[in-house]
């Protein structure tokens, strides 16, 4: 079975069924989806919609019960656990709600961590260069030696994003990445994602918040394991503009008598 080679993601009639006792739970029901390089897609849905199950399959953390999933032209639907682990490390960068940083390790060393498990055995000097570049991409080029307890929540999430980028993945997969952040810091982090996407980095973001999804370019909504909406984002939000307006408002308050 062939697939378009220019697609980052192609899902074809994906089903996922969990067997719990005498009851079969159909978490994902016949989902088909195509994502091109450089897209910025939000996957939305309420609890029980199937979005988390779909994310796990896109992230090669789980396999579909039936259907096919191609990542960068590779059919990963039937790969064994070891092969899936290689695919995850090489082609997918993960950003989670929790930062999951090593407390006694610098920002640079945290970002270098995925390179230690890269089967290509990247030389140490290149690991250092890649990690430094990743931190520069997320605006932390001057914080490479800082430990997590020396960084704000937003800065820690930037380190986590840098870590996700260091293997130069085909796909950045973010699961509720602003869930632990205050509103202003959330806007700043969405600004980081928007700037990365401007550099043609493909991003899929799983969220239940419409305000977060509006920073993306395309919104896919699930209900009862099926896609019910797949359309371009209307009235898209732009983090840089919102931050500028917020700073102006804060300055006006300071200047008020």
What is the predicted role of each segment?
Residues 7-222:
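ABC family nucleotide-binding domain
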